[in-house]
């Protein structure tokens, strides 16, 4: 399954807030959501499926990519769900988003694909690059690249920068201090349901 490129509001109308996908706020009709819930008996499979979809759309992954991360997480020490979230959070496109260099993960991916991002003074054009502690992330040709950073995002996005990241706005430089803690993951997700969904595939 390829990466989703359709209307983003359609996705958050079905799955709820996904800050990595879009920063737009859905305005639902009064009683619309409650009516949908009351008229449908939701199966356990559907609940697990929707949690998986939240993860996939928030981080902008294909089905194959997400399954690959699940398989890696299963082989690692510790809780599979926690390891899975850590792997996704440490992707370069997500780290750029969490640093406040982009308002969405698709926007961050565009910065990477257009070769605006350097890690430890080396150009990186792979959005799925696995960031590590002590990595230094900078904007290549900062005067040009800054034009791609949305204005007004500093106060809102960067005020919520997780504790494993630091951003120096004066230099346009981000620092990775450590692997992210579960409590600093902004997405409202039950990762155990995602693991259960893939239990027969991974």
UniProtKB/Swiss-Prot annotation:
SUPFAM superfamilies: Alpha-L RNA-binding motif. One of its GO terms (molecular function) is rRNA binding. It comes from the Eukaryota. Transmembrane segments: none annotated. One of its GO terms (cellular component) is chloroplast. Keywords: Chloroplast, Plastid, Ribonucleoprotein, Ribosomal protein, RNA-binding, rRNA-binding. The keyword Plastid applies. SMART domains: Ribosomal_S4, S4. GO terms for biological process: ribosomal small subunit biogenesis; translation. Gene3D superfamilies: Ribosomal Protein S4 Delta 41, Chain A, domain 1, RNA-binding S4 domain. Residues 90-148 form the S4 RNA-binding domain. Its main location: plastid. It is found in: Plastid, Chloroplast. Pfam families: Ribosomal_S4 (PF00163), S4 (PF01479). One of the primary rRNA binding proteins, it binds directly to 16S rRNA where it nucleates assembly of the body of the 30S subunit. With S5 and S12 plays an important role in translational accuracy. Part of the 30S ribosomal subunit. Contacts protein S5. The interaction surface between S4 and S5 is involved in control of translational fidelity. Belongs to the universal ribosomal protein uS4 family. This is Small ribosomal subunit protein uS4c. It comes from Haplomitrium hookeri (Hooker's flapwort). The gene is rps4.
